[in-house]
Structure formats: structure tokens, C-alpha cells
């Protein structure tokens, strides 16, 4: 998938299995 640099979550598909893995950039990683 297309993951934004420095994130695990945002993009088409994701590398994080749970919201617990979002870390300090949760808002960005969850594409809010």
C-alpha cells in the first residue's frame, strides 16, 4: 500500500494491526 513517510496507518492498506500501534502520530496515521 501507499504509506505516508513516518506513519504506519495512513494510505491504501496499512502496516499496523491495531490502533495501539499508531503511536504519537495517531491523528496522521489514522488519516483524520
Curated annotation (Swiss-Prot):
Its main location: secreted. GO terms for molecular function: phospholipase A2 activity; toxin activity. It comes from Rhopilema nomadica. It catalyses: a 1,2-diacyl-sn-glycero-3-phosphocholine + H2O = a 1-acyl-sn-glycero-3-phosphocholine + a fatty acid + H(+). One of its GO terms (biological process) is arachidonate secretion. PLA2 catalyzes the calcium-dependent hydrolysis of the 2-acyl groups in 3-sn-phosphoglycerides. One of its GO terms (cellular component) is extracellular region. Its EC number is 3.1.1.4. Binds 1 Ca(2+) ion per subunit. Belongs to the phospholipase A2 family. Group III subfamily. It holds the Pfam family Phospholip_A2_2. It is an enzyme of class 3 (hydrolase). Its cofactor is Ca(2+). It is found in: Secreted; Nematocyst. Keywords: Hydrolase, Lipid degradation, Lipid metabolism, Nematocyst, Secreted, Toxin. Transmembrane segments: none annotated. The keyword Hydrolase applies. This is Toxic phospholipase A2.
Amino acid at each position: 500500500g501507499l504509506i505516508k513517510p513516518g506513519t504506519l496507518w495512513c494510505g491504501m492498506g496499512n502496516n499496523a494491526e491495531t490502533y495501539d500501534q499508531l503511536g504519537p502520530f495517531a491523528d496522521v496515521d489514522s488519516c483524520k
